[in-house]
Amino acid sequence: MRDKVSGARRWVVKIGSALLTADGRGLDQAAMAVWVDQMVALRAAGVELVLVSSGAVAAGMSRLGWASRPKAVHELQAAAAVGQMGLIRAWESSFARCDQQTAQILVTHDDLSDRKRYLNARSTLRTLIDLGVVPVINENDTVVTDEIRFGDNDTLAALVANLVEADLLVILTDRDGMFDADPRHNPEANLISEARADDPALDAVAGGTGGALGRGGMQTKLRAARLAARSGAHTVIVGGRIEQVLSRLKAGERLGTLLAPECNRHAARKQWLAGHLQTRGTLTLDEGAVLALRQGNRSLLPVGVRAVQGAFRRGEMVVCVGPQGAEVARGLVNYSAAEAQRILGRPSDEIEKLLGYVDEPELIHRDNMILV
């Protein structure tokens, strides 16, 4: 299974607070530079990279002179606000040293649960990745409450992995991976090298919580791996203090714990789509479009659509039928019903002229479609 790591094209890398701070005394610039060198090397090897970075609250605590993590939400938000500026500036300057462009993205779980905002975030991230930019993502701790109390960037990283359809999620932690017993108390504990993410036996060995600076223990990392597995991504939980750990993972070394999904990314995506039983509208296709979908594994373009029915919004499930009304496919549509009415039967290069903007060149992308 390790070839799934070395051969992964799109990585989401999550780095925890403990790996970015100097024992609670602010950001460790030297450590961040080492991480950047490894990530730039991954980029040079053809890896598309998204970074999910913890550390804003920890950095803010240091700047404010707080020795322990506060419990009051408004104090946590203040620390996040103070620390986020230093955190993103540190990443930007370190990446700039290697001529690597970065982008800051602050999100909440709500941004990824609302379908329209989810699609907008996905489009932005895809564009940044296509441009060769490394997005640096953090949870917007300054404006949320429940996430600060109960959330964690492990979960956020898994949601981002689903969002960008990553092949691999790497969760870097202060432990070397998952063990069959707690290595802090049992010297006979063995590292679990590989397992299925859905293996129920893992629940018994994933006890424990995060440290003083972070908030995600091994249980949250296991939950994150299972969440990422829903879209077919593999997850490696690995020690961030292992020298050149990212480069060595890319080289195929068996480091950390590799948690595999039940099925590959493409199959997982199709299963997820098949589970959407409720449809919001119907697109009637011409014979050419039907043939392209059935034989060519193509996306559905506006030029092949003859009629639109229903009141659907962007991102909702619609049915595609042929000229005689027989169902051909169903999928997630990139434009609302009103927008689809205006562009049906027209080539994709006219979308911007007709609507004043263009989100995607296709009505339904083939990755968001299942044939019937």
Curated annotation (Swiss-Prot):
Enzyme class: transferase
SUPFAM superfamilies found in the cross-reference section: Carbamate kinase-like (SSF53633), PUA domain-like (SSF88697)
PUA domain mapped to chain residues: 280-358
Enzyme Commission number(s) of this protein: 2.7.2.11
UniProt pathway: Amino-acid biosynthesis; L-proline biosynthesis; L-glutamate 5-semialdehyde from L-glutamate: step 1/2
Pfam family name, one: AA_kinase
Domain of life, source organism: Bacteria
Main location as per UniProt: cytoplasm
Catalysed conversion reaction: L-glutamate + ATP = L-glutamyl 5-phosphate + ADP
Gene3D superfamilies noted in UniProt: Acetylglutamate kinase-like, PUA domain
UniProt-annotated location(s): Cytoplasm
InterPro entries in the record: AceGlu_kinase-like_sf, Asp/Glu/Uridylate_kinase, G5K_ProB, Glu/AcGlu_kinase, Glu_5kinase, Glu_5kinase/COase_Synthase, Glutamate_5-kinase_CS, PUA
Record key words, sorted: Amino-acid biosynthesis, ATP-binding, Cytoplasm, Kinase, Nucleotide-binding, Proline biosynthesis, Transferase
Residues at which ATP binds: K14, T173, D174
One biological process term in Gene Ontology: L-proline biosynthetic process
Signal peptide start-end: none
Gene Ontology molecular function terms on file: ATP binding; glutamate 5-kinase activity; RNA binding
Cellular component GO terms, alphabetical: cytosol
Binding-site list for substrate: S54, D141, N153
Family: Belongs to the glutamate 5-kinase family.
Function, as annotated: Catalyzes the transfer of a phosphate group to glutamate to form L-glutamate 5-phosphate.
Protein name: Glutamate 5-kinase
Source species of the chain: Stutzerimonas stutzeri (strain A1501) (Pseudomonas stutzeri)
